[in-house]
Curated annotation (Swiss-Prot):
The keyword Repressor is assigned to this record: no
Signal peptide: 1-19
Assigned keywords, A-Z: Endoplasmic reticulum, Membrane, Signal, Transmembrane, Transmembrane helix
Segments crossing the lipid bilayer: 162-182
Annotated protein name in UniProt: Increased recombination centers protein 22-2
Topology versus the membrane: Single-pass type I membrane protein
Species of provenance: Candida tropicalis (strain ATCC MYA-3404 / T1)
Length: 236
């Protein structure tokens, strides 16, 4: 196999694969590829992987070369499909691998990191491995893996949530201060009780009580004119 020509073309792996996929014919290869999820190795192809948006998951591949000639693993990609309609939802970023040469009857391992950022739903992940074989870059699809993707639960102590809470608190505080300055002060001034000053009365004037002037008749004679009193006395 002319690996020198293949390795020279590795910088254009994606373009080469695209040309092969559109114009090339299918080739039967005796290459077995399987993978497991590093974070949840107990998940098999019959199980459903529970993934969270914003997290990264590592696929650990094992490639077995049962061909009579040497092969080379040169890249990996994949896609998320709708498991019901089989329509492609999104493609994974194509990553270059090695190249890693695999002798006949041998196996190698490599990893692929998958960034999960999808609308919460059920998907089927189908990875694809690029293999150089017989002077061609061949795309070998792997088994599908069902995955249920959900959004991450927001913690009360999440820095993003704390920042949002501070922003809202500052906003409401500013609005409250503005309302108080515009209407609050005037309202409080209009409803506050007014203290009326009490005028103090002057010092009490002592009233001298007139001593009653007694008379034989038994009534007060102080108000009777003196001339009249003298006249009455003469008559008496």
């Amino acid at each position: 196999m002319k690996f020198s020509a293949i390795l020279t073309a590795l910088t254009a792996t994606i373009a080469t694969v695209a040309g092969y996929e559109t114009s090339g014919k299918p080739h039967t290869v005796d290459i077995l590829i399987d993978y497991s999820i590093k974070e949840t190795p107990e998940i098999s192809q019959t199980d459903v992987a529970n993934w969270v948006n914003g997290q990264k998951y590592t696929l650990e591949y094992v490639v077995n070369n049962n061909e009579e000639t040497e092969i080379a693993v040169v890249g990996v990609t994949g896609q998320f499909k709708n498991p019901v309609t089989n329509q492609i939802v999104t493609n994974l970023t194509t990553g270059q691998v090695g190249p890693i040469a695999v002798a006949p009857g041998e196996s190698i391992k490599f990893e692929q990191i998958v960034d999960v950022d999808l609308i919460p739903d059920n998907y089927e992940l189908i990875p694809h491995v690029f293999v150089a074989h017989d002077d061609l870059i061949k795309v070998i699809p792997c088994r599908g893996q069902l995955a249920s993707i959900v959004d991450a639960a927001v913690s009360f102590f999440d820095p993003r949530l704390i920042f949002l809470e501070l922003v809202l608190l500052a906003t409401f505080g500013g609005i409250a201060y503005f309302v108080y300055e515009i209407w609050g002060k005037q309202y409080l001034r209009g409803t506050a009780p007014v203290k009326v000053p009490v005028k103090k009365s002057g010092s009490p004037v002592a009233v001298k009580e007139a001593s009653p002037v007694g008379s034989a008749s038994g009534f007060d004679e102080s108000w009777i004119p003196e001339a009249h009193l003298k006249k009455n006395k003469k008559k008496a």
